[in-house]
Regions:
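Active-site phosphate/pyrophosphate- and oxyanion-stabilizing loops and adjacent acidic/basic residues
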Residues: 15
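The −1 position to Zn-ligating cysteines in a subset of zinc-ribbon hairpins
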Residues: 23-24, 38, 77
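Histidine-centered catalytic micro-motifs used for acid/base chemistry in nuclease
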Residues: 38-44
Length: 138
């Protein structure tokens, strides 16, 4: 596969990705239907153009040997998680979620008020995605 060329993911590979976490989004753990699943690249394709310089060469090599679309680089994702992760790798996505949640709890008047009235409870996120909890339990 040439660098920058996006090769469609086969139905068989999509099924393997879906089965990886038994029909759950690898990030939030929500149950998803096969037709709703989006296939996320752990190391984003966009890193070849927009990512950190040290990752760009790694992604170019992944295009050459086609490992960019290998099962080890693919995760089942719900639409919301795939959209929110965007072109981030796992660590940047994790940090983005943590900082957004912390910011919302500190800065949003509505959130603080809802917490004050017991409408919502703040439980600090352990920073682990669904797939990481699954790997720990297996």
């Amino acid at each position: 596969m040439k660098y920058g060329e996006r090769k469609p993911i086969s139905k068989a590979m999509r099924q393997q990705v879906y089965d990886k976490y038994h029909g759950h989004c690898a990030y939030c753990g929500r149950k998803i239907e096969m037709k709703e699943m989006q296939v996320d690249h752990i190391i984003p394709i966009a890193y070849s153009c927009y990512g950190p310089r040290d990752k760009a060469e790694e992604v170019r090599k992944m295009f050459e040997d086609e490992s960019i679309n290998a099962i080890g680089n693919l995760m089942p994702a719900c639409r919301a998680c795939n959209f929110y992760k965007g072109i981030n790798d796992i660590e940047r996505f994790r940090n983005r979620i943590k900082s957004e949640l912390d910011h919302t709890c500190r800065q949003s008047f509505q959130t603080r008020l809802a917490m004050q009235y017991g409408i919502i409870k703040y439980e600090p996120w352990d920073g682990k995605f669904y797939f990481e909890h699954q790997q720990e339990n297996s």
